[in-house]
Curated annotation (Swiss-Prot):
One of its GO terms (cellular component) is cytosol. Keywords: Hydrolase, Manganese, Metal-binding. GO terms for biological process: negative regulation of transcription by RNA polymerase II. GO terms for molecular function: metal ion binding; metalloaminopeptidase activity. Mn(2+) 2 binds at D397, D408, E520. Pfam families: Creatinase_N (PF01321), Creatinase_N_2 (PF16189), Peptidase_M24 (PF00557), Peptidase_M24_C (PF16188). The lineage of its organism: Eukaryota, Fungi, Dikarya, Ascomycota, Taphrinomycotina. This is Uncharacterized peptidase C22G7.01c. It comes from Schizosaccharomyces pombe (strain 972 / ATCC 24843) (Fission yeast). Mn(2+) 1 binds at D408, E506, E520.
């Protein structure tokens, strides 16, 4: 649906003129650099009409540009009105939004941005780039101009109660996590560490919340020194159970007090992550803060034994729900019934809700038929979504939050007869998926270094996909978790893959206007016993967590090697052996058919 943004832009430009801004930048993120935001923080979506999870809007006196990546080109082109220019990131000749700001400004002109919505390193780099290339000035505004335009209709910020993540799922207590953090701080020679990422706060204190849809986190900051810890959170969210849980470890203070405490602090060596906002950095003093790789991010990414146990168990239960759903949908459609994409997604959620550890979805289900599958992050509308066409490819990317883990799985199905091109491209993507599943690599390897394995077979035919190959997955936390992941962007070269990390493995192929195919398993990284250990290195590999059948109608066996056939048959055998005892009679029969040897 297209939102007409002319009036909103006119009001914003009036405010820009009052403050002397040539350009005003509206990022996607909230004050905690979150990828997914609550409704009150969806400022870029409000001003532009584009509601994908990634993108940046830059507004000028007569211009409005929306920058996003390949996952959202189709969606953005459908949602932006005539006031906007879509800037397709990664295409030759298309600047980044930062480069665009330098191109569109002159000496002494001002570029405005809410200082809480840009990270300190990004603000510092942009400030220097503007000064050197155009002579313009970056202004960190303490007001948000979009909020002013939004006015009274802006949604209220959530006030959901916090819950305690039980030690049997968390694996480590708050005292142990604080001890480990302080040891890391000593190694870095810092007096304090500012925790600003919401999933890091939640993980550190074994708490979960519901402030951001699909992500069990809550708005908070934390300041940890070598002998004290402070949690800045709206105290209306804190239950007696939470207070008891934190007693003796951390002092609870009002959320907004973090800024005054920062300004009055005597600390001089303060560690911050690269995701900490410019506003926080300036509150402490830019000369006092040191951007470092967050020790919490590293610890959180490597799942402990309890977290891995939970991830394995929740993926089994989730696999059962997915099989029950596809068995039901297959029978329903082939009996001549009709159902739209949204109602099908709702039915899948109903199967997941039958599990008593179910806490919600981990993202909005991508239930897409035919050409909608080519929209990589498609969301079926509640009203007017397409009827699932059994003669076309159906792509379903879904996941759930359970008390013991988080899931994310994509299966692409055909309930009729696919074309040769559909089978060919699906098989090429599946071959890339298998190549990653079977890889053995030395410790120290990054996700950036192995991304090519997933794309190689598509590349041979001059094909590719415009998204990353894998992202980290939290443990009853965010379904997208950095720095873990596999992809061609620099961020995936920043930290090596390590045993205990969980990532997705999800190559795909998309033909605009026709269909999309994606195959996604969650995997965990584990040590591999190799015959040799060159230079004494440890070798690692991937182990599937996701258990769900692949659509054999979309597999062309003539394109598979004997090793790939062996992998698929062994995987399907594991799927059937593990899931079948917990399935209904009809789902068990369906699964037997769809896990038969190739």
């Amino acid at each position: 649906m297209v939102v007409h943004t002319g009036n909103r832009l006119n009001k914003l430009r009036e405010l820009m003129k009052e403050r002397g801004y040539t350009l005003y930048v509206v990022p996607s993120e909230d004050a905690h650099s979150s990828e997914y935001t609550c409704d009150a923080d969806a400022r870029r979506a409000f001003i532009s009409g584009f509601d994908g999870s990634a993108g940046c809007a830059v507004i000028g006196e007569t211009s409005a540009a929306l920058f996003t990546d390949g996952r959202y080109f189709n969606q953005a082109s459908q949602q932006l009105d005539e006031n906007w220019t879509l800037m397709k990131q990664g295409f030759t000749g298309v600047p980044t939004w930062e480069e665009y700001c330098t191109q569109m400004t002159k000496c002494n002109e001002k570029v405005g941005i809410d200082s809480s919505l840009i990270t300190f390193p990004a603000a510092k780099a942009l400030r220097e780039s503007l000064f050197l290339k155009s002579g313009a000035v970056l202004v960190g505004d303490h007001d948000n101009l979009v909020d002013i335009v939004w006015g009274a209709s802006r949604p209220k910020e959530p006030l959901e109660k916090l819950i305690v993540q039980e030690i049997k799922y968390a694996g480590l207590g708050v005292d142990e996590k604080l001890h480990n953090l302080r040891e890391a701080m000593k190694e870095q020679k810092i007096e304090a560490f500012v925790v600003s990422m919401l999933d890091e706060v939640a993980w550190l204190y074994n708490l979960r919340g519901a402030d951001v849809p699909y992500n069990p986190v809550f708005f908070a900051y934390s300041l940890v020194t070598l002998d004290e810890a402070f949690l800045y959170v709206d105290e209306r969210k804190v239950t007696p159970e939470v207070s008891k849980h934190l007693d003796g470890f951390v002092k609870i203070l009002p959320y907004d007090r973090v800024f005054s405490d920062a300004k009055n602090s005597n600390l001089t060596r303060i560690g911050i992550s690269s995701k900490t906002s410019w506003c926080i950095a300036t509150s402490f003093g830019e000369t006092k803060v040191m951007p470092i790789l967050s020790p919490i991010s590293q610890a959180k990414g490597i799942k402990n034994d309890a977290e891995l146990k939970g991830m394995k168990e929740c993926h089994i239960r989730d696999g059962c729900a997915l099989v029950e759903y596809f068995a039901w949908l297959d029978e329903y459609l082939n009996s001549g019934n009709k159902i739209n994409e949204f109602d099908a997604a709702t039915k899948l959620e109903q199967f997941r809700r039958k599990n008593n550890l179910f806490m919600g979805l981990s993202f909005e289900t991508i239930s897409s038929t035919g050409p909608n599958g080519a929209v990589i992050h498609y969301s079926p509308p509640a009203t007017g979504s397409a009827i699932i066409d059994p003669t076309k490819i159906y792509l379903c990317d879904s996941g759930a939050q359970y008390k013991d883990g988080t899931t994310d799985v994509t299966r692409t199905w055909h309930f009729g007869e696919p074309s040769e091109f559909e089978r060919q491209t699906a098989t090429l993507a599946l071959k890339g998926h298998i190549a990653l599943a079977n890889i053995v690599f030395p410790k120290g390897t990054t996700g950036y270094m192995i991304d090519v394995l997933a794309r190689q077979y598509l590349w041979k035919y001059g094909l590719d996909y415009l998204h990353g190959t894998g992202h980290g997955v939290g443990s009853f936390l965010n379904v997208h978790e950095l720095p873990v992941g596999i992809g061609s962007r620099e961020v995936f070269n920043s930290a090596p893959l390590q045993a205990g990390m969980v990532t997705s493995n999800e190559p795909g192929f998309y033909e605009d206007g026709h269909f999309g195919y994606r195959v996604e398993n969650c995997v965990y990284i584990t040590e591999v016993n190799t015959e040799n250990r060159f230079a004494g290195r440890t070798y690692l590999g991937l182990k599937d967590l996701t258990l769900a059948p692949h659509c054999q109608k979309l597999i062309d066996p003539s394109l598979l090697s004997p090793e790939e056939v062996k992998y698929l048959n062994e995987y399907h055998s594991e799927v059937y052996t593990t899931l079948s005892p917990m399935l209904s009679v009809s789902a068990k029969k369906w699964l037997s058919k769809h896990t038969s040897p190739i």
